[in-house]
Amino acid sequence: MFTLKKSMLLLFFLGTINLSLCEEERNAEEERRDEPDEMDVEVEKRFLPVIAGVAAKFLPKIFCAITKKC
């Protein structure tokens, strides 16, 4: 009876370790999937001020040309 309990405990322990390793791999895969999204946000942050600067330069000229009130 003792050997049966010992082997069952060993199987439970190994199964628990295997399950935790699978969860770690799953978390690592999710982190890898998140990286491109973070890179997209960084790219947006870099280009947004440039676009705003260009718009600030040309909007008054365009508004002046449309309304002809310069």
Curated annotation (Swiss-Prot):
Q: What residues does the annotated propeptide cover? A: 23-44
Question: Can you say where in the cell this protein is located?
Answer: Secreted
Signal peptide location:
1-22
What is known about the tissue distribution of this protein? Answer: Expressed by the skin glands.
Sorted alphabetically, which keywords does the UniProt record give?
A: Amphibian defense peptide, Antibiotic, Antimicrobial, Cleavage on pair of basic residues, Disulfide bond, Fungicide, Secreted, Signal
Question: Superkingdom of this entry's organism?
Answer: Eukaryota
Sorted alphabetically, the Gene Ontology cellular component annotations on this record are: extracellular region
Biological process terms from the Gene Ontology for this record are: defense response to bacterium; defense response to fungus; killing of cells of another organism
Disulfide bridge positions per record? 64-70
The text of the family note is: Belongs to the frog skin active peptide (FSAP) family. Brevinin subfamily.
> What does this chain do?
Antimicrobial activity against the Gram-negative bacterium E.coli, the Gram-positive bacterium S.aureus and the yeast C.albicans.
Its name, as the record gives it, is: Brevinin-1PLc
Organism of this sequence: Lithobates palustris
Taxonomic lineage is:
Eukaryota, Metazoa, Chordata, Craniata, Vertebrata
